[in-house]
Swiss-Prot record:
Lineage of the organism: Bacteria, Pseudomonadati, Myxococcota, Polyangia, Polyangiales
Name of protein: Chaperonin GroEL 1
BP-aspect Gene Ontology terms: protein refolding
EC number(s) stated in the UniProt entry for this protein: 5.6.1.7
Reactions listed under catalytic activity: ATP + H2O + a folded polypeptide = ADP + phosphate + an unfolded polypeptide
Length: 562
């Protein structure tokens, strides 16, 4: 085991602060409509130009092990906010730096870090309550477009396209982002169904970079029970191979010999196939499998109907234009089922929704209806160069997450003003002990995003903060137009969910760092002096003989049986 270096109290916190500041200073320059770009070197290809906080944070790795610990903890703030809310990563980083930086001064001045933490936790809970109280539900398409525009760095074209997409497929619909071969950014909508089950084996992946499996015009087998014996599946597979088609298998599970054989033959190029677990449980799974069967025109193999898999033919399989599968989700695009049967199924589900008395059943039926009737919208992002394309695609993805968050929990005034105003809710929070110092710390820290937005726009943050303080609740500084106005009326709005997660995650990690008393890291290894002469080169190793191919079992046609 390598020797460790251990640093205590003041030295430990100073090392963390250095790492926090290095990462946060690189990230916070991207905040707001006048935020600057960060250029990131790649080991291959052209550098990445980005204004996305989490992209910058993920690339920062410091040479000093102790400082790097601080940087990685703030990186966790950005990543967690991105995972939970999809946006607000830069705001979260700015808040974490402000809370930790201010808190560290107080700890060094002799305040108890544990009492500070308790005060910070209580203050943040109050701020979140104020943000949620101020949130208003999204009224119309225009507000959704405004949220997307703000998140996409003021790009109105992206805002409008995402608002159109959400209008076409509904709030429950699926919206995906792809690269366009042309220079323009376009919206395509197609009928599709999404459910939360991914591929059963990563060996089914067709795009290793995105870790997705994409099947074009595949045949689709819908089977209720587990498939484990290859002998049951083989007659059908041989028919599929003869037709030269791709295959999607949907069943309770595919395991053992059956899964191993599918993987081997996929890797050998005998058949392009993917297996996915059926969505839902119990009777609900049966219903969803029937939905998928009707959508794709398949005959579902159900146990209670006495159908046997070994008697299946290609005529029993459904089909769709395209199927996209990642580790968690499957999207069936443009199922080729009978339109009249699909409409009949939709009407039957609507009738069940009207008749049911259970809220839980109603919710699940509405989910099924959305999956069957909802579509898939594809935003195709175009740009003049690959570098611009990647940067624009990242902005579209951010904006998409922001619009979903806005629909979920409503909107608040943007430009850092929602948190700035929430500070007023802390006036009534009094403990009459050391915790009050933590509350005052949060009051100052929540102003940091507004000040940083102003600073990035080339304006003095303190002057802007004082002017905003004297205005109405929705009055603030619009950095895009360099003017003071009613930001809500001007369309400068943020999703409440993003603001909530940003302050919550930032305070959580900052408080942890404030209560750190020791750091343990590996000691840097001393460089050994170079040897006098290089040893003679080793003789090349003889190549290993090629392994013979696996013989197919008799009567099994083209299939290798693992």
């Amino acid at each position: 085991m390598a020797a460790k270096q251990i640093v205590f109290s003041r030295g430990a916190r100073a090392a963390i602060l250095k790492g926090v500041n290095t990462l946060a200073d690189a990230v916070k320059v991207t905040l707001g409509p006048k935020g600057r770009n960060v250029v990131i070197e790649k080991s291959w290809g052209s550098p990445v130009v980005t204004k996305d906080g989490v992209t910058v944070a993920k690339e920062v790795e410091l040479a000093g092990k102790l400082e790097n610990m601080g940087a990685q903890m703030v990186r966790e703030v950005a990543s967690k906010t991105s995972d939970k809310a999809g946006d607000g990563t830069t705001t979260a980083t700015v808040l974490a730096q402000a809370i930790f930086g201010e808190g560290l001064k107080l700890v060094e001045a002799g305040h108890n870090p544990m009492d500070l933490k308790r005060g910070i936790d209580a203050a943040v809970a109050k701020v979140i309550e104020a943000v949620q109280k101020a949130a208003k539900p999204t009224k119309d398409k225009d507000q959704i477009a405004q949220v997307a525009t703000v998140s996409a760095n003021g790009d109105k074209e992206i805002g409008q396209i995402l608002a159109d997409a959400m209008e076409k497929v509904g709030k429950e619909g699926v919206i995906t982002v792809e690269e366009n071969k042309r220079m323009t950014t376009e919206l395509e909508t197609v009928d599709g169904m999404q459910f939360d089950r991914g591929y059963l084996s990563p060996y089914f992946v067709t795009d290793p970079e995105k870790m997705t499996a994409v099947l074009t015009n595949p045949l689709i087998l819908v089977h209720e029970k587990k498939i484990s014996a290859m002998a049951d599946l083989l007659p059908l597979l041989e028919q599929v191979v003869k037709q030269g088609r791709e295959l999607l298998i949907l069943s309770e599970d595919v395991e053992g010999e059956a899964l191993a054989t599918l993987v081997v033959n996929k890797l050998r190029g005998t058949i392009k196939v993917a297996a996915v677990k059926a969505p839902g449980f119990g009777d609900r799974r049966k219903d969803m499998l029937k939905d998928i069967a009707i959508l794709t025109g398949a005959t579902p193999f159900m146990e209670d109907l006495g159908q046997k898999l070994e008697s299946a033919t290609v005529r029993d399989l459904g089909t769709a234009k395209r199927v996209e599968i990642d580790k968690d989700n499957t999207v069936i695009v443009d199922g080729q089922g009978d339109k009249t049967a699909i409409k009949g199924r939709i009407e039957a589900i609507r009738k069940q929704i009207a008749d049911t008395t259970s809220d839980y059943d109603r919710e699940k039926l509405q989910e099924r209806l959305a999956k069957l009737a909802g579509g898939v919208a594809v935003v195709k992002v175009g740009a003049a160069t690959e570098t611009e394309m990647k940067e624009k695609k990242a902005r579209v993805e951010d904006a998409l997450h922001a619009t979903r968050a806005a629909v979920e929990e409503g909107i608040v005034v943007g430009g850092g003003v929602a948190l700035f105003r929430a500070a007023a809710s802390l006036e009534s929070l009094k403990f009459n002990d050391e915790r009050d110092v933590g509350v005052r710390l949060v009051r100052r820290a929540v102003e940091a995003p507004l000040r940083q937005i102003a600073q990035n726009a080339g304006v003095d943050g303190t002057v802007v903060a004082e002017k905003v303080r004297s205005g109405a609740p929705t009055f603030g500084y619009n950095a895009a137009t360099d003017s003071y106005e009613d930001l809500l009326a001007g369309g400068v709005i943020d999703p409440a969910k993003v603001v909530r997660h940003a302050i919550s995650n930032a305070a959580s990690v900052a408080a942890l760092m404030l209560t750190t008393e020791a750091l343990v890291a590996e000691k840097p290894k001393k460089e050994k002096a170079a040897a006098g002469g290089a040893p003679g080169g080793m003789g090349g190793m003889g190549g290993m003989g090629g392994m013979g191919g696996m013989g197919g079992m008799g009567g099994m046609g083209d299939f290798d049986m693992g």
